[in-house]
Amino acid sequence: MRTLVIASGNAGKIREFQGLLQHLPLNVQAQPQGFDVEETGSTFAANARIKATAVAAMAGSWALADDSGLSVNALGGAPGVHSARYAPTDPERIEKLLGALSNASERHAQFCAALCVAAPDGSVLIEVEGRCDGWITTTPRGDGGFGYDPIFEVSCTGLTFAQMPLTEKKSHGHRGKAFALLEPQLQDLLSAEPR
């Protein structure tokens, strides 16, 4: 069975990917603790590629990397590729973002997820992107999810990601949409392998 290393130290992302990948014939593993890849790209896709190729080379197996983030219209697209580094912790990131929007009437935002699967030789096997439109709430709502999930209300649902069960988040969310594009390509790669 092919090993696929999730190129992330984020426990929430790892759990989400393990759930999304559970029905595929893959041995899904987290990247080794303490291995960190500097995200120097200017786009989500570039950062996903940087992480996937570095982790695949280090682990000697395929690696799946995600770079995702939140872009808020009223903030000129910020926090964008700096979403994870906008402040030190999830609660501080939420507080900082809500503070930046305290007087804003325009609260539209978009989550983007770029996924990349790379091989140990550095080749990129798959690259896809998924997006989800919504807006930033004035206060956190819900106990699920991670990151900005409690303050991102998904368009046409009335719910934040933190209020959604994983199945609903998968169908509406940026990562789920990206995964829907990635999954058939990953299945094709797996079925093309010699047995």
UniProtKB/Swiss-Prot annotation:
EC annotation from Swiss-Prot or TrEMBL: 3.6.1.66
GO molecular-function terms, A-Z: dITP diphosphatase activity; ITP diphosphatase activity; metal ion binding; nucleotide binding; ribonucleoside triphosphate phosphatase activity; XTP diphosphatase activity
Catalytic reactions on record: XTP + H2O = XMP + diphosphate + H(+); dITP + H2O = dIMP + diphosphate + H(+); ITP + H2O = IMP + diphosphate + H(+)
Function: Pyrophosphatase that catalyzes the hydrolysis of nucleoside triphosphates to their monophosphate derivatives, with a high preference for the non-canonical purine nucleotides XTP (xanthosine triphosphate), dITP (deoxyinosine triphosphate) and ITP. Seems to function as a house-cleaning enzyme that removes non-canonical purine nucleotides from the nucleotide pool, thus preventing their incorporation into DNA/RNA and avoiding chromosomal lesions.
Lineage of producing organism: Bacteria, Bacillati, Cyanobacteriota, Cyanophyceae, Synechococcales
One BP annotation, GO: purine nucleoside triphosphate catabolic process
Cofactor(s) annotated in UniProt: Mg(2+)
Keywords annotated in UniProt: Hydrolase, Magnesium, Metal-binding, Nucleotide metabolism, Nucleotide-binding
Active-site residue numbers: D67
Gene Ontology cellular component annotations, sorted alphabetically: cytosol
InterPro entries: dITP/XTP_pyrophosphatase (IPR020922), ITPase-like_fam (IPR029001), RdgB/HAM1 (IPR002637)
Family stated for the protein in its record: Belongs to the HAM1 NTPase family.
Organism of provenance: Parasynechococcus marenigrum (strain WH8102)
Annotated residues for binding of substrate: S8, G9, N10, A11, G12, K13, S68, F146, G147, Y148, D149, K169, H174, R175
Top-level taxon of origin: Bacteria
Pfam families: Ham1p_like (PF01725)
Binding of Mg(2+), residues: E38, D67
Entry's cofactor comment: Binds 1 Mg(2+) ion per subunit.
Quaternary state and interactors: Homodimer.
Protein name: dITP/XTP pyrophosphatase
Main EC class the enzyme belongs to: hydrolase
